[in-house]
């Protein structure tokens, strides 16, 4: 069953309205990595984008908590 962003992921966003920002981040990172997101994209390429999103979100959270490890 599709969620707010139209994907079939079971992950739920804790912050209402964050889906648009996450999608924007996903497409920006994919562009930086030269990945064209779509049905033909490999799991490895998608994983690299997802992994980078996770790294950036963790870094952002650390900075917000005052432990700014970069």
Swiss-Prot record:
UniProt xrefs under InterPro entries: SASP_alpha/beta-type, SASP_alpha/beta-type_CS, SASP_DNA-binding, SASP_sf_alpha/beta
Instruction: Give the UniProt keywords, A-Z.
Output: DNA-binding, Sporulation
| Designated name of the protein | Small, acid-soluble spore protein 1
Which species is listed as the source?
Bacillus subtilis
Q: Could you say which residues are annotated as the site Cleavage?
A: 28-29
Q: Does the keyword DNA-binding apply?
A: yes
**Function, as annotated:** SASP are bound to spore DNA. They are double-stranded DNA-binding proteins that cause DNA to change to an a-like conformation. They protect the DNA backbone from chemical and enzymatic cleavage and are thus involved in dormant spore's high resistance to UV light.
What GO terms are given for molecular function?
double-stranded DNA binding
The remark listed among the other comments is: SASP are degraded in the first minutes of spore germination and provide amino acids for both new protein synthesis and metabolism.
| Family affiliation | Belongs to the alpha/beta-type SASP family.
Instruction: Please give the biological process terms from Gene Ontology that the record holds.
Output: DNA topological change; sporulation resulting in formation of a cellular spore
**Membrane-crossing segments per the record:** none
């Amino acid at each position: 069953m599709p969620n707010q962003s139209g994907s079939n992921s079971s992950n739920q966003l804790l912050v209402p309205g964050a889906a648009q920002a996450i999608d924007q981040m996903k497409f920006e990172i994919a562009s930086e990595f030269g990945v064209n997101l779509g049905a033909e994209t490999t799991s490895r390429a998608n994983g690299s984008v997802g992994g980078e999103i996770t790294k950036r979100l963790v870094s952002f959270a650390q900075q917000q908590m005052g432990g700014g490890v970069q």
